[in-house]
Amino acid sequence: GDHEGAKYPNWVTCPWPEDFLAILDWQWNEKVIPYWQEAGAFALAHNVPHIAFEMHPGFCVYNPATLLRLREAVGPVIGANFDPSHLIWQGMDPVAAIRELKGAIYHVHAKDTKIDKYNTAANGVLDTKHYSDELNRAWIFRTVGYGNGETYWRDLVSNLRLCGYDKVLSIEHEDSIMTIDEGLQKAVAFLKGVCIFEEKPTTMSWA
């Protein structure tokens, strides 16, 4: 929220009017950082080495810069649950975000987003219409491969490996025009074609 007695979130997205900056300063320095410093210490004391934040619009941590700000204040116990779907519609390049977060990615969601070029051309990407109003929304979540193609996903998984993440890709199904069963089957089949399964080579016979 934006004050001590607030009941609802208040996501500040621009620096003017100046009241917004005062809200941000209060949120971060009086609430967010102290809370997670305490929670991070508690986690470490109980043998939980990582807390993974999903960078999500509407929250204090919504992009690499805000994730790294919290990580700098709290320590490496804080990292990212990297979900590209929330970055795509904000206009970020998830591969660039992966590189920014090198060493700080602790989990990855395999989920896609499709931008509607007609609706965004008219009204931009900030959209409060219900997710079921697919035809009129600026963007919707899609099964992997239905928002971005193979080239995009090959680049994404390759950069995850290059930046030190070679673990689970957790399929998250939030595709409103495809059943869970069909979405899961298609996601598994798609990812099998783009993921790298064998260990990274330790030698290069050509170099």
Model-derived segments and spans:
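Short, flexible loop/turn segments with low-complexity composition
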Residues: E172-H173, E199-A207
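Conserved, mostly hydrophobic/aromatic
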Residues: V32, I51, L67, D83, ...
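Gly/Pro-rich active-site loop or hairpin
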Residues: N29, P64-L68, I88-G164, D181-E182
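A general structural motif
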Residues: H46-H50, G75-V77, G103-I105, L162-V168
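C-terminal helical cap(s) of enzyme catalytic domains, especially alpha/beta-barrels
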Residues: I180-K200
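Active-site acidic/histidine proton-transfer and metal-coordination neighborhood
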Residues: G1-G79
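A structural alpha-helix within SAM-dependent methyltransferase catalytic domains
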Residues: I33-G40, L44, L68-R71, K102, ...
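Active-site beta-loop-alpha junctions enriched in small/polar residues
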Residues: G1-D2, H56-G58, D83-L87, K111-I115, ...
